[in-house]
Amino acid sequence: MARILSSLKARERVTRIVAPAYLFAAVAGLFASPASARDLEIPERRQFHIDSSVNPCDDFYKFACNATIKGFSLPETKSVYNFGADDAKEKLFIARTKLLEAVVRGQATRTPRMAQVARHYQSCVDTDRRAQSEREAVKRALALMAKITTREQMQALLAANILSGSGDFSVVHAESSYSFENPIISDLSLSTDFIALGGRDEYSDKGTLSNYAFILAKFFKAIGAPGAPETLADDVVEIERRVGLKEPESFDLQKRQMLPKEVSREWALKALPNLKLQTLLARLPSNIKIKMPVPEQMKALDTVLKEAPLEALKALYLYQHLKDSVSLGYPSFAAEWAQYKANTFSDPKEPTGKEKCATDVIELFASELDAEMIDTLYPGFRREPVTEIVERVRAAMVKSLKRNKWLSPSARDEAARKIETARLQLVRPEEERHWDYLPVTELSASDYARNLRAIKAAKSKKAVGELSGARDLSKWYSNPLEFNASYSPQENSFFLPQGILIPPMYDPADPEWMNYAGIGATIGHELGHAIDVNGSKYDHTGRLRQWMSNADLAKFNALNQRLVDQFDKIGHDGKNTLAENSADLTGLLFAYEAAFPNSSGTPKQKREFFLQYARGWCEVRDPKGVKEFLSSDPHSLGQARTNEMLKHVGAFAEAFKCKAGDKLVLPEKSRLRIW
C-alpha cells in the first residue's frame, strides 16, 4: 500500500496546474481573478490531492476527494458544489457576463441576435427604468382585469394565451413532445403551469399554506389590487391547493413526464370544456396527438375554472402574470418575498443586482451567447480525439452486448443495434441552423417588463413552429458550452457538448486512460441509458416498443433489483435512482474496458484511472439539502456514485491491492454486471 500511495503522490506533483493551451487562450486574463461576485476562487485547473490517512479500499471517495473538500467553503449561493461541473459553470458564467457587458459597451460584435440580448440586459440593469417598467406592467394588468366581467371572458383569455403572441399568462403549459411512433413528429404535451409550492405534501400542510397566503396578501396590497388582499390571497392559495393536491410525488411525476398518457382530441375537448382547448388546437395540425403527464390534474384545473369565483381567477392571473415584475418597482414587497423564500425553501441565496440580471439573461439567451464565444474560448479544438474515445467506448459496449448470455437472440441483436446506430451530437452544432436560438425579437433597452412578455411570445412562436412541422433531429436543444451530456431514447441520440470537454473530464494533454476515466465514463453512462430500465422501452429507431421478451424482462429486472437493494441499504431510494445507478455502473465498466483493452495497462495507470473517475464526483453539499435531494433526485450522492460502483469492479481491488474484508471488496459472485 505504501508503494501505491507513493506513486499516486508522484503523479499529483506532476499534474499540470494550468488549463490546456487551447482553452481560453484568446481571452487572456478572463479567469485570472476570482469570481468575486459569487465569492469563489476558481483555479484554472483544480488540483486533487489524495488523503493518505484513508484506506482507499474502505472509502475511495474520501481517499480521492477529502483533501479538496476540506479546504473548500460552500458559497451561500450554492446548496451543492461539484468541483468539476461547478468550476466549469462558474468560469462560463464569468465569460458570458463579460461578453454581455462588452456587447453593451460596443466592444464586441453587435449582430441582430446579440443586439436583442444586449438590450434586454440593459433593461434589467437600468434600475430606474426597470422600476418604472414594472409599475407600468402592473397598471396594464389591473386595467385588463377590470375589463373582465364574466367567467366566460376569463376562460377565453386564459385559453387565448396558450402559446400565444401576447406573452401573457395562461393556466396551461403547452410544448412539443416526441411522438412514440416517429421521432421526427411532434406531439402536443399539456400540463398545468402555476403550481408554486411543490406537490401534495406542501398543499396538505396548513402551516405552509398559511405562510404562503400571508406573503400573497402582501403582494396584492403592494400592487393595489381591488378587493381585500387577504381574501385574494386565500382565493389563490385555494386554487393552487385544489390543483396541487393532484400533483404526483416527484419520482412518479418524472416517470409520467417520460411516458405521458396519450389522450384523444375528442376526450380533451369533452373532459376539459372550461379550458377551451379548441382555441389552441385550431392553430395546430388537425392530426396532432395530445399527451398529458397528469390528466387528473388537468381535470382538477378544469373544475377550478368552472367553480372558482371570478375574482379568484383574476387574482390568480395577476399574481402569476406579475410575480416576475415586482422586484425594483415594489422594493418593500421584494424584500419580504426574498425573506419568505429564504425561510420556506432550502434553496441557496439568490444573486442580486447585475449578477441576477446576468443570470436571467444567460438563461434566456445561452445559445446566442455561446455561438459568439465558442471559437474564442476553444480555438483550434480538435473533434477527432473525442470522437475516437466515443467510438472505442461504443465498440466495447457492442462487443459485450453481442456476447451477452442472458438475453434472447433477438433482444441481444436489438440492444447491440441501439448502441451501434445511436446518433452522435459531439462538441458543437456543425451548421448554423442546428443552433437552438430564439427568434430575433424587437426588445427594448428600457422596458424590462415588456421584454419578458415579448420573449415569452417568441418562445410560443417557436413552439408552434415545432408543433407544425417535422422535427430536425440534428438540432441542438442544449447549449454547447454547458457542462453536461445527455441521451435521448426517443431519438436514440447522444449529446456530448464542448462545455464538458475540460478537466477533470477531458484534457488532450493528459494520458488517454485519464480521459477514459473522465469523459469515457460519461460517454458510457449516457449510452448506458439506451439500455437501462427506461431507455430499453424504446427501440433503435426511437419508437416505444417492447423488444425484450417477457423472459428477458424477468432476468433484467432481477439484475436491476440487486442494484435497488444495494442502494436501499445505504439510505438512497434504490428504485427511483435505478436508471442513473445502472448507467453509472455501465459507464465505469465500459470506460475501463475501452481504456485497457485485453487487460492491457500497468497497475499505476489503472490506479490513476480510478482516481480520475472518483474526481468527477467530488462535491460539497449543504447538509440541510441532503434529505430533499435523496427524496426527489434520480441521482445518488457523489460518495455513493464512487464507492458503490467500485465494489463491482474487480480491477479496482487488484489495482489497490485490496483484500477480503475491506469495505469496497465484494466476492466475485456478488459483483454485478448487467451488460
Model-derived features with residue positions:
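Hydrophobic/aromatic-rich, well-ordered segments within soluble, folded domains that form packed cores
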Residues: 49-70, 202-220, 588-590
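Noncatalytic, helix-rich "gating/capping" subdomain that lines the substrate-entry/channel surface
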Residues: 100-392
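Intrinsically disordered, low-complexity linker/terminal regions across diverse proteins
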Residues: 38, 236, 242, 274-275, ...
